[in-house]
Amino acid sequence: MTGSAEYSARRVLPDAPLLAAATGRTPSRRPVWFMRQAGRSLPEYREIRAGIGMLESCFDPALVCEITMQPVRRHDVDAAILFSDIVVPLKAAGIDLDIVAGVGPVVANPIRSIADVAALPRLVPEEVGAIAQAVRLLTTELGSTPLIGFAGAPFTLASYLVEGGPSRNHEKTKALMHSDPKTWHALLGSLADTTICFLQTQLKAGVDAVQLFDSWAGALSLADYREFVLPHSERVFAEVAAAGVPRIHFGVGTGELLGAMGEAGADVVGVDWRIPLDVAAGRVGPGKALQGNLDPAVLFAGPEVIDREVRRIAAEGDRAIEAGAIGHIFNLGHGVLPDTDPTAITSAVELVHSL
């Protein structure tokens, strides 16, 4: 386990609203940021990414810095999130994969056996040195705005490696999980090592919080999540605890898993739009902050609807705090959709800050 001394270069941001809300202190304003806030919804992003592949972009420190900064400048959000992708550490380690436009990550040689797991390359920090350099650039550029680092959770990474790409039903993943638990746990153990290395690299470079994305965990029953996934996510959170920064845990469609996801060790639990925040607070239990949970599609519905729904989410966040949550960070229930009008995002941020 990495000691706290290795994280000593981090900025001190005592007044950052996001960090206050995440740790049970009273923020100076209601903090808000959006998953995928740096991306295709911004014309400046589309311009700077023209002709440059996604993975190539993720390994260019100056480009990562600029893309990460774009929504902070435009929207006045309370955090930047590192521009990257959950498969970046897999690519860096040497796994043969690519991000195909309109499809997503595609893996050349899907995992099928314990021998395949044993052959997986292990990430070392030097292979993600470009990401660490981008973090260092950003901590200089951001001033008093926190930087959130992130990684994919072992289960979601495993799903890509077993399926060979995105999957609606995750049938190959679940088949391996149930039919060959030994291989499954070996795979998730290996991926947990990769995730820990990637997060620790970002933390040592200076990120102020981290988010673990378990994008596909909602495909699982609670019993399967507890048996096959929770121990590995729990180890990830434990191994980065010494950094002393807020740890956020998020998945889509995880309303029935929220209690278990909270048990994994995060300080903040992300909630998608399918469950009210005050209900989520009861499932997560006291002592955690909540993050969420405006439906991303609401941003297409016009100013009156956005105004109403933002106010509703903020009120539910307040009730969640009354129900035992230690704070609320306003966010979407998933990522910003590519065709979202950026002015709708800016307006939503202004409204959140006024409440």
Swiss-Prot record:
Which is a GO BP term held by this UniProt record?
protoporphyrinogen IX biosynthetic process
Any idea which GO molecular function terms this record carries?
Answer: uroporphyrinogen decarboxylase activity
Q: Which CDD domains match?
A: URO-D
As recorded in UniProt, its EC number(s) are 4.1.1.37
List residues binding substrate: 36-40, 85, 160, 215, 334
Location(s), subcellular: Cytoplasm
Is Transit peptide one of the keywords? no
Q: Which SUPFAM superfamilies match?
A: UROD/MetE-like (SSF51726)
The region annotated as signal peptide is none
User: Location of site Transition state stabilizer?
Assistant: 85
Substrates-to-products reaction catalysed: uroporphyrinogen III + 4 H(+) = coproporphyrinogen III + 4 CO2
Give the pathway: Porphyrin-containing compound metabolism; protoporphyrin-IX biosynthesis; coproporphyrinogen-III from 5-aminolevulinate: step 4/4
Q: Which UniProt keywords apply?
A: Cytoplasm, Decarboxylase, Lyase, Porphyrin biosynthesis
Q: Name one GO cellular component term.
A: cytosol
Q: Which Pfam families match?
A: URO-D
PROSITE patterns with a match to the protein in the record: UROD_1, UROD_2
- Summarize the subunit comment: Homodimer.
Question: What's its job?
Answer: Catalyzes the decarboxylation of four acetate groups of uroporphyrinogen-III to yield coproporphyrinogen-III.
Q: Which family does it belong to?
A: Belongs to the uroporphyrinogen decarboxylase family.
Instruction: Please state what the protein is called.
Output: Uroporphyrinogen decarboxylase
- Which species does this protein come from? Rhodococcus erythropolis (strain PR4 / NBRC 100887)
